[in-house]
Regions:
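Activation targets extended, charge/polar-rich intrinsically disordered C-terminal tails
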Residues: 1-60, 174-175, 179-269
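Glycine-rich catalytic cores of cysteine/serine-nucleophile enzymes that process amide/ester linkages
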Residues: 61-161
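Second-shell loop/turn segments in exported
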Residues: 83-86, 158-168, 193-202
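Phosphate-binding glycine-rich loops and adjacent basic patches that engage nucleotide phosphates
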Residues: 131-142, 166-178, 201, 205
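A structural motif
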Residues: 147-190
Length: 269
């Protein structure tokens, strides 16, 4: 269901639900993840059902996120996600980019090259396939096919540094990043590693270098670096120089990790 409900996240010893403005309760019968209850009880939030199922009860998973009114200007946000200490491929952290509410994620894994909504990128709960394996605490696919991808909301897994730029041409920027996704999904698969993007390369074809090339193509031509943190710092430096000339509004902030038992603290790369 794509119906989005807003209300106050409410929890007591026996129950949890969304209390709506008209006094009605929603999701009272559903399992609401403890991470949401611990961080956001008493706050205004949005919620909807995901198509993925909770392994405990077979019901659709409830996703909850902060109720923040959307921007009414074209914007982009560049994200530098700190590294996950559990996984060596995460040694350098990760980059992603949001254009007008659509997050472009590029990865060495073919199925993680996608456009994803803000709430699913940052705030998916550690339930069902998004959770770490109960036996190893890591990514695991069991013999019966049950998957634990250990891929829940990024803000519960790490601290994220944000470069926000308002006043861009959103449709032009989106078309650039859409073309990169098409290119990746049209790359012939290596039959020995069908789950991997065959042309991935840390120095020339990675999450951060694709974003760097896209921003250069858009017009920020001097951004350089190839690791996520380097590209983030270079982009901030270069785009700040453009802000008066291009009538852009530029800001930087961080989203501290929302600590939950399913993820250790992230670290700077």
């Amino acid at each position: 269901s794509n119906t989005v409900y807003t209300g106050i996240l409410t929890a007591d010893e026996t129950n949890s639900f969304l209390l709506r403005r008209d006094g009605s309760r929603v999701f009272e019968e559903n399992h609401i993840w403890d991470g949401y209850i611990n961080h956001w009880t008493g706050q205004n939030v949005c919620a909807r059902l995901l198509r993925q199922k909770d392994y405990e009860n077979g019901e659709p998973i409830v996703i909850i996120w902060p109720d923040i009114s959307p921007a009414n200007v074209d914007f982009m946000e560049l994200y530098y996600n700190e590294r996950l200490v559990k996984y060596w491929p995460s040694l350098f952290g990760h980059s992603a980019i949001c254009v007008n509410g659509r997050i472009y994620n590029y990865s060495h894994l073919i199925n993680e090259n996608e456009v994803i909504s803000i709430e699913e990128y940052f705030y998916r709960p550690a339930l069902g396939e998004f959770a770490p394996s109960p036996s190893t605490g890591l990514f695991e696919i069991l013999d019966d096919g049950t998957a634990y991808y250990d891929k829940f909301g990024r803000n519960f897994m790490r601290t994220i540094h944000v470069l926000r730029v308002e006043g861009i041409n959103g449709s032009r920027m989106r078309s650039i990043f859409d073309r990169f996704l098409e290119m990746i999904h049209n790359t012939p698969v290596n039959p020995k590693k069908p789950e991997k993007w065959a042309d991935f390369n840390l120095f020339t074809n990675s999450c951060s270098t694709l974003i760097k090339f896209g921003l250069r193509k858009y017009g920020f031509s001097k951004i350089n670096g190839f690791l996520p943190r380097d590209v983030f710092v270079s982009a901030a430096y270069e785009i700040l120089k453009y802000q008066n000339k291009e009538n852009l509004s530029v800001s930087m902030y961080s989203m501290p990790q929302l600590k939950v038992p399913e993820a250790p603290y992230s670290k700077m790369s």
